[in-house]
From Swiss-Prot:
InterPro entries: DHAD_IlvD/Edd, Dihydro-acid_dehy_C, DihydroxyA_deHydtase, DiOHA_6PGluconate_deHydtase_CS, ILV_EDD_C, ILV_EDD_N, IlvD/EDD_N. The keyword ATP-binding does not apply. The modification N6-carboxylysine is found at K123. This is Dihydroxy-acid dehydratase. PROSITE patterns: ILVD_EDD_1, ILVD_EDD_2.
Length: 558
């Protein structure tokens, strides 16, 4: 087997290259071993990533034990939970591209033979997957693990509990002292946010596509099994290099369909739609919003998980994790059994010893004939407000239909102020625009407004639509990723206060109820907004980024 790294290790002309490698610990025999990058997302910025360095060191040792040469390098992270509701959140989706670009750059510049990527916070997972697909060298993803639930008076808490408590405080439902108690107890240690929010959703999707080990996506960050799984991941990667198993061998159209099915079954985040579209783009796989809707129609929500449900991800792990969910779907004919994994097994082989039915002593994972919801919770809506499409999350509500007057805001901050001063009422359709990939730029998540609405008891009585995104912690009648976005002239830019808007997840419709002639009149008066940034990261991003309906990628025109 000829190693890619031979480009820097073999031949007399590579003596200077070897000299550099000797300075970082290479010996004579090491130049014939595979060089494996460890893309380490360690950071003290966020609890999601604070434990990653320990896992990276375990991976480093295991790679050496299996006769590989590890080379560790850092990737960035942005804490969505900390930047949420601020200008800093504009950098969150941007960080997905920075992570992908940094991994691709480091691995390709150093002619690495494989990569083991370790991540925790939301954009770490899709960022790593974009890089793996682009490079197509053997790779495996190690998830840093989920956080255990916080506890207060016997109740399980997550970070979303704190966001909702803000709304509860402003509506007089709790005291400031109770808010502080929630704040102090909702995040007890290391790990990614504990519900089926974006990080856990994307780790589940990666496991479903075969690029991480079975059960690894639901493990708690602080449990010993996470270390063992990391060590095993290093061993599996070495074997994949020897067998030349590459990401694009695994990232087939059927693998993406499997991932979408799992996302629906676990009640995952709307962000999975955006990220899977982007990963498919980097993989050369044709994937559209319409395919998410087709899968939603046949795949039920099987897991009762927060934000809209009862349990957290560690409970899912105890109940059998993603393999149990996949086995139920496999038995129902809803996932492809022939897709392969990084262990060079088919999905059918991987799930051979998993029971066909979930354990009877739990209700985290429901049997197929007794689901939480009969259809998936991520609906693709189209209409004159979203001709390219939009993504509605309809879990946690009894009636996913609302027609009401628009209350229009040009930014998240303006909207949140109106909510907290009780200017939003039952039946309203809240519109937050100019928060899209270009207009934000960066497509901020609207967790603060949606949580405040829920906290005030309006979660089933108010709809919120935006060209921005939603956190995985959001639930209620919310519609995001509206495309085309306002900044490029989408019809969401033409809505005025008081316009009647219909959101109907049953008919898959999102529309403003005015005459086409009036829309044309307003369009004739519309002026394209000036860019908010003319330089730097955000200026560059706004210039390059595609529509959210295409995954908000930055290399679409390459």
């Amino acid at each position: 087997m000829k190693l890619r790294s031979s480009a820097i290790t073999q031949g007399v002309q590579r003596s200077p290259n070897r000299a550099m490698l000797r300075a970082v610990g290479f010996e004579d025999d090491d130049f014939n071993k595979p060089i494996i990058g460890i893309a380490n997302g360690y950071s003290t910025i966020t609890p999601c990533n604070i434990g990653l360095n320990d896992l990276a060191k375990q991976a480093e040792k295991a790679i050496k034990d299996w006769d590989g040469m590890p080379q560790m390098f850092g990737t960035i992270t942005v804490s969505d939970g900390i930047s949420m509701g601020t200008e800093g959140m504009k950098y969150s989706l941007v960080s997905r591209e920075v992570i992908a670009d940094s991994i691709e750059t480091a691995c390709n510049a150093q002619s690495m033979d494989g990569v083991l990527a370790i991540g925790g916070c939301d954009k770490n997972m899709p960022g790593a997957m974009l890089a793996m697909a682009r490079m197509n060298i053997p790779g495996i993803f190690v998830y840093g693990g989920t956080i255990k639930p916080g506890k207060l008076n016997g109740e399980d808490l997550t970070v979303v509990s704190a966001f909702e408590a803000v709304g509860q405080l402003t509506s007089g439902k709790i005291t400031k002292e109770k808010l502080i108690e929630v704040e102090k107890h909702c995040i007890p240690g290391a790990g990614s946010c504990g519900g089926m929010f974006t990080a856990n959703t994307m780790s589940a999707a990666i496991e479903a596509m075969g690029l991480s080990l079975p059960h690894s996506s639901t493990m708690a960050a602080e449990d010993q099994e996470k270390i063992k799984s990391t060590q095993k991941s290093a061993e599996v990667l070495i074997k994949a290099i020897k067998e030349n198993i590459r990401p694009l061998d695994l990232l087939t159209k059927q693998a993406f369909e499997n991932a979408i099915s799992v996302v629906m079954a676990v009640g995952g985040s709307t962000n999975a739609v955006l990220h899977l579209l982007a990963i498919a783009h980097s993989s050369g796989v044709e994937l559209s919003l319409d395919e998410f809707e087709k899968i939603r129609q046949r795949v039920p929500v099987l897991c009762d998980l927060k934000p809209s449900g009862k349990y957290v991800t560690v409970d899912l792990h105890k109940a059998g994790g993603i393999p149990q969910v996949m086995k139920i779907l496999l038995e129902a004919g809803l996932i492809n059994e022939n897709c392969r994994t990084i262990e060079n097994k088919t999905i059918k082989e991987m799930l051979l010893d998993v029971p066909a039915e979930p354990p009877s002593d739990q209700d985290v994972i429901r049997p197929f004939d007794s689901p939480v919801y009969k259809k998936g919770h991520l609906a693709i809506l189209k209409g004159n407000l979203a001709t390219e499409g939009s993504v509605a999350k309809i879990s946690g509500i009894k009636e996913p239909i609302l027609t009401g007057p628009a209350k229009v805001f040009e930014s998240e901050e303006d909207c949140l102020k109106a909510i907290l001063t009780e200017q939003i009422h039952s039946g309203d359709v809240v519109v937050i625009r100019n928060e899209g990939p270009v207009g934000g730029p960066g497509m901020r998540e609207m967790l603060a407004p949606t949580s405040a609405i829920v906290g005030q008891g309006l979660g089933e009585k108010v709809a919120l639509i935006t060209d921005g995104r939603f956190s995985g912690g959001t639930y209620g009648l919310v519609v995001g990723h509206v495309a085309p976005e306002a900044a490029v002239g989408g019809n969401i830019a033409l809505i005025q206060d008081g316009d009647s808007i219909t959101v109907d997840a049953i008919q898959k419709l999102i529309q403003v109820n005015i005459e086409e002639a009036e829309l044309k009149r307003r369009r004739s008066l519309w002026v394209k907004p000036k860019p908010k940034y003319n330089s730097g990261v955000l200026g560059k991003y706004a210039t390059l980024v595609s529509s959210s309906s295409k995954g908000a990628v930055t290399d679409q025109n390459c």
